[in-house]
């Protein structure tokens, strides 16, 4: 079951003069919305818990060259609460959600050793408007959300958990069933992030566009149990330059790019309203950011 809950990742924040290879990414946790992206749940409440682990051991330059090696890891546990209305707006089912993340991060390099780390409440994410349409062979969702800087952030600190800025989001998810029995599905999820200026630094991190996608095949295991298996991937691109005090022309021009492919499985028990999921992604050909892998484990229950 797809709880349709984009939430947000903590941002490792260092001044450019402190560590040139610690480029930021967007704040969306890539890959989490790859499966059943256009599907809206049945009316009622859903609780979802998502555990994400991102591990990166190389920093890539603007041409994809390795600038440094070390470790950048992010652990997140996100509790999401979704309400789906039984009423429709513009022919679409209306829903809303809130996501509260707890996070832990660390950054180290082979040359400099431990650089930063922090843990605690991260930035929370709210989606006051989710509209979902569906036909016999497709589903689509349109979303407005915003990221509130509730995580700890102080300019120059080495234990930040939050980003230090607000983010507004426009997103959409689509799922297309390729077969009449709906056992083969292609899904895509797009998100555009509008970032404000970072508190205490005056830095504008640049805007970001992200894409998650999947091709999944459902295998019935019993009358009340099914398994989805397939291929997943994600992409992310910085669309505008970073700007602000201390940002050089070279740093402003170095827009990050992220690519990943992997595999996933979802176990569904629809009569009980329970879903379990596992995704693994391996990144490749990244530019101006870290490169590594991601493991994501999810569970949800509908009431």
Which role does the model predict for each range below?
Residues 21-24, 36-44, 85-95, 133-140, ...:
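Short loop/turn motifs that connect adjacent beta-strands in outer-membrane beta-barrel proteins
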Residues 24-25, 53-76, 110-120:
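Surface-exposed strand-loop-strand hairpins of Gram-negative outer-membrane beta-barrel proteins
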Residues 37, 49, 78-83, 126-132, ...:
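Residues on the lipid-exposed face of transmembrane beta-strands in outer-membrane beta-barrel proteins
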Residues 43, 71-79, 115-125, 162-168, ...:
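Residues that define the transmembrane beta-barrel architecture of outer-membrane proteins
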Residues 45-55, 96-104, 142-148, 188-194, ...:
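Transmembrane beta-barrel strands of outer-membrane/channel proteins
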């Amino acid at each position: 079951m797809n709880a349709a809950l984009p939430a947000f990742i903590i941002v490792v924040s260092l001044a450019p003069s402190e560590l040139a290879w610690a480029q930021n990414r967007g704040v969306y946790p890539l890959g989490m919305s790859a499966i059943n992206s256009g599907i809206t749940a049945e009316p009622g409440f859903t609780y979802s818990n998502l555990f994400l682990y991102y591990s990166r051991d190389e920093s890539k330059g603007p041409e994809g060259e390795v600038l440094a090696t070390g470790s950048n890891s992010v652990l997140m546990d996100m509790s999401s609460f979704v309400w789906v209305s039984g009423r429709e707006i513009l022919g679409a089912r209306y829903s809303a959600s809130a996501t509260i993340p707890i996070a832990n991060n660390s950054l180290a390099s082979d040359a400099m050793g431990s650089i930063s780390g922090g843990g605690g409440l991260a930035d929370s994410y709210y989606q006051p408007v989710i509209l979902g349409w569906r036909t016999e062979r497709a589903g689509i969702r349109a979303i407005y959300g915003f990221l509130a800087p509730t995580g700890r952030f102080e300019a120059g600190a080495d234990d930040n958990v939050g980003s230090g800025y607000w983010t507004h989001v426009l997103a959409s998810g689509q799922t297309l069933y390729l077969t009449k029995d709906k056992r083969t599905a292609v899904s895509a999820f797009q998100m555009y992030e509008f970032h404000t200026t970072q508190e205490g630094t005056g830095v504008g991190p640049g805007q970001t566009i992200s894409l998650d996608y999947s091709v999944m095949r459902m295998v019935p295991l019993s009358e009340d149990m099914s398994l989805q298996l397939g291929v997943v991937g994600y992409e992310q691109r910085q669309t505008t330059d970073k700007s602000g005090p201390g940002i050089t022309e070279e740093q402003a021009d170095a827009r990050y790019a992220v690519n990943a492919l992997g595999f996933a499985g979802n176990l569904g028990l629809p009569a009980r309203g329970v879903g379990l999921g596992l995704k693994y992604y391996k990144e490749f050909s990244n530019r101006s950011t870290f490169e590594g892998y991601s493991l994501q484990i999810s569970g949800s229950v509908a009431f």
